[in-house]
Amino acid sequence: MYNNKTMGSNKTIIINLNNLEHNLNLIKNKIGEKEIVATLKGDAYGHGLINIFKFLKSKNINYFGLSNIEDAKTLKKIDKNIKILMYIKVDKKEIKNLIKFELVPFVSDFEYLFLIEKECALQKNKIKVHLKIDIGMNRYGIKIDDALEIATYIQNSKFLELEGICSHLPSIENFKTTQKQIEQFLFFLETLKQKNIHPKFVHISNSGHIINYKLNPQFNMVRPGLILYGYCQSLKNKKPALNFKPVLSLFSKVIFIKNVKKGEKISYSGIFQAKEDMKIGIIPIGYFDGIPQNISNDFYFLINNKKCKIRGKVCMNLTIVEIPKDLKVKTGSKVEIVSEKLSIDEMSKFSKRSHYELLCNIGKYEKRKYLD
């Protein structure tokens, strides 16, 4: 529970582990027996890699998805038995650590495979890999027309085990496009079966797919990211069916109060001019802290459950809000910036920035308080 004693500085990030467990249970109930890969890239979306990892591990999650090999090494040093999927290629000089720490890379080209095989030979070891197929994202992944050749090569390699086949759905909000891409992927799976290639795991489901679609029984692994942290992308004109709870909250406090006379301008460039005498509060948080500057002048924070509109430009480390006439505020009063009452959905819609970007920017650099 947040209160003024919880906050030891001008800004406090609270991570609610009860809400994380709630979201995890919703996912488990939706997917049944499928294996979960908890996506922890981007410092667990700004929630803190190590603490989120430890909590999810305590809830019997065994697979984790990362993009940074330094993060992978950190987690492997905590628990060498966990399984980590590396979503993107590691640097050439880190391939030895890929093998040493028994990480599971997503592979999509022969050059990368040859480097991995060479290192496996040196270490006299074998590595599991997941073949990443591109079905429309045009990002990391081999084009589906070229995928059979590389799958066959992996199948026949004495240093590689084709543990998984995977892809990524880029346009979850577009049902027809997504269904077509899934059909392409399923057709490729049938081709593999005809060649007697049977990977243990087949996975294509990100957060949006898990929540909005019926999952094909062949997909026995899922990769939730954003929904773990309390947010989900829905199909157009469709409300989310599940009640996810935000895990991250951001609080600050009022550090200065002053009166502004009618006609006076506020903050840089004077983009706000007072239409009447008003009282303003100074909040020690700004765009350095992940608050997008384009919410200047009209978005709001909450003080004592009342909307306090931002006035003037959001500054690097300060934001100015108007204090309503009927609201009693004093120096030290709590300010809610992201919370269960004011979810990041609102800031995302207003700023036209994604939940991903906002969460990562808000959580960057900061110490967090973990509540359970």
From Swiss-Prot:
What InterPro entries does its record include?
Answer: Ala_racemase (IPR000821), Ala_racemase/Decarboxylase_C (IPR009006), Ala_racemase_C (IPR011079), Ala_racemase_N (IPR001608), Ala_racemase_pyridoxalP-BS (IPR020622), PLP-binding_barrel (IPR029066)
Named cofactor requirement(s): pyridoxal 5'-phosphate
Per the record, the pathway is: Amino-acid biosynthesis; D-alanine biosynthesis; D-alanine from L-alanine: step 1/1
- Where is substrate bound in this sequence? 139, 316
Keywords linked to the UniProt accession: Isomerase, Pyridoxal phosphate
Enzyme class, UniProt record, top EC level: isomerase
According to the UniProt record, list the residues that bear N6-(pyridoxal phosphate)lysine.
41
Q: Name one GO cellular component term.
A: cytosol
One Pfam assignment: Ala_racemase_C
Residues the record marks as active site: 41 (proton acceptor), 268 (proton acceptor)
Q: Which reaction does it catalyse?
A: L-alanine = D-alanine
Q: Which GO terms describe its biological process?
A: D-alanine biosynthetic process
Q: EC number(s) per UniProt?
A: 5.1.1.1
State one molecular function term (GO): alanine racemase activity
Family assignment?
Answer: Belongs to the alanine racemase family.
Its function, per the record, reads: Catalyzes the interconversion of L-alanine and D-alanine. May also act on other amino acids.
Q: Which NCBIfam families match?
A: alr
**Could you tell me what this protein is called?**
Alanine racemase
Annotated source species: Borreliella burgdorferi (strain ATCC 35210 / DSM 4680 / CIP 102532 / B31) (Borrelia burgdorferi)
